[in-house]
Amino acid sequence: MQSKKLFLEVIGKLKDEEFEDLFSSLLSSSEMKDISRRLMAAKLLHKSTTYEEVQDIMGMGSNTVNKIYFKTKGSPILRKLFGRD
């Protein structure tokens, strides 16, 4: 749990333009791509795109889409972020 606390502390101190630098320093391009794709899938699900459509659009399996849905449904922060579109 110390690592999670450190992560949240560091994130809280960052200015907007520093996020990309931090994540580029810590994550491989593959990890960045995976996170970006999961975020896009969560957004599509938030916009009521069907599981099957998300699978086709994102090239993800049903288990991955299902996991993303259940981990993100009802998330206040995602509602706030995705509700702006």
Task: Enumerate the predicted regions with their spans.
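Short alpha-helical "recognition helix" segments of helix-turn-helix
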Residues: 53-58
